[in-house]
């Protein structure tokens, strides 16, 4: 087997060897381009009773009300997010070419940025990186978003997004926003409350 591989490389031209090396490096770079832990942020200390009612909370060390990450997303919030933010969430692989094409057309037509075309996966990457919005950064977000789709399930990506999305002031994440604005847990949000929170990060 080893001799066959060696003979294969011997018969390749220099150009093909260089090209194969570049492709190999790109594939390896893509595999390892995403950090094992996306978010490196402090979280609030939260105390709840056995029924999940909030008894108290302590602000995170960076001055943000950021409750610990969620493992699931309430159904109403999930549906509102997909309706308002990313209708093709369950059908794309991190990047939605149709949304990007539509956003590009709208931006050119209006001669200013009116739409970003980002999927929820791309927005999750943006929240994790917290970099300036530039064309180069958008390309990086697209690459990392496709990589995240290979690593995590759609539900895990949604949970990452709702746990770290900004909801105004120093309120970060769905749980902190739900208690801050409505005085109850995210599981008890009404449709109207869910719709409001779904569009608030924008």
Which functions belong to the PLM regions below?
Residues 1-202:
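Juxtamembrane regions of bacterial inner-membrane/periplasmic proteins
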């Amino acid at each position: 087997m080893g001799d066959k591989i060696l003979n294969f490389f011997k018969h390749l031209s220099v150009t093909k060897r260089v090209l194969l090396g570049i492709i190999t490096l790109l594939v390896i770079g893509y595999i390892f381009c995403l950090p094992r832990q996306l978010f490196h942020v402090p979280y609030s200390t939260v105390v709840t009773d056995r029924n999940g009612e909030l008894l108290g909370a302590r602000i995170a060390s960076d001055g943000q009300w950021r409750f610990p990450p969620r493992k699931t997303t309430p159904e109403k919030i999930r549906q509102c997010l997909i309706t308002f933010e990313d209708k093709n969430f369950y059908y794309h692989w991190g990047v939605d070419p149709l949304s990007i094409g539509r956003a590009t057309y709208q931006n050119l037509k209006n001669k200013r940025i009116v739409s970003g075309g980002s999927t929820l996966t791309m927005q999750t990457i943006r929240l994790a990186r917290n970099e300036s919005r530039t064309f180069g950064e958008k390309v990086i977000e697209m690459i990392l978003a496709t990589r995240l789709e290979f690593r995590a399930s759609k539900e895990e990506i949604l949970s990452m997004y709702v746990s770290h999305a900004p909801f105004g002031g120093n309120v970060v994440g769905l749980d902190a926003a739900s208690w801050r604005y409505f005085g109850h847990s995210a599981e008890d949000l009404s449709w109207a409350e869910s719709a409001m929170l779904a569009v608030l990060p924008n």
